[in-house]
Amino acid sequence: MLRLFSLISVLLFLPQWVMAGQITAKGSDTMVRLCQRLAEEYMKSHKQTVIQVSGGGSSSGIAALINGSTRVCASSRLLTDAETRVAVTKGVKVFQLVVALDGIAIYLHKSNPIVDLTLGQLRDIYTDRITNWKDLGGPDRPIILYGRENNSGTYTYFQQQILGGEDFADRCEPLPGTAAVVHAIAHDINGIGYGGIAWATSIKYAGIKVNDSAQAVLPSAANVSDRSYPISRELYFFLNGEPTGETKEFIDWVLSSTGEKVVVESGYVPVRAK
């Protein structure tokens, strides 16, 4: 009886993901919808496995991977140098794989007459150099900025790739997830926001031009797949070491044709061109 009690006590205090048949996936809010669909479909044919999915942002997922509280980190960005150093210090050997492609779409209200923007204009909008739609050929109305919180991989990617490392304008309203950004733009005729292409409903996309003389490109699956859309990116799973056991079975399934079908059905772009 004492031995049984001791075993139960140990199990109660083990991290949840240590238990057999349980996998946790935590991180990117951009990827939550994808991870939920992948988990649901996988568990239909693997009834002995429980996959728990949560968001919180790429930074939170990476921190959870490093501290051992999640088995799979979903991230819309790579690790920073600082995160890599902490991982090494903690003895975490980060294993990286690309599970899908995505484009960062620029969201506008459906009634906004603006059709396209250059990368330079985007930078100037989000750093407060351009503050009125009339400066872009639109109506004389203020541009209302919406973005993501700084624990978001999308925030980090946008700041690095579009703003060139500059800070966002102080008046940019940070929102906790892509769905919140879409909701804000749908209800603000003067708003502009950014986020993944899988989330856009009730709003419209702006075409993106590399420069004034370039052709505008919309964030379609085809344009993300061939990288003609200027703000295309990879979506990652990070693990501590190469996957084994149940985790490997799940990862192999995600990368299979069955998993890629779920990627497409969820509104994301498969790694392998169709």
Question: Language-model segments: what does each one mean?
Answer:
Residues 4-14:
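Sec-dependent N-terminal signal peptides
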Residues 14-20:
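Sec/Tat signal peptide C-region and signal peptidase I cleavage site
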Residues 20-274:
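Exported/periplasmic ABC-transporter solute-binding proteins
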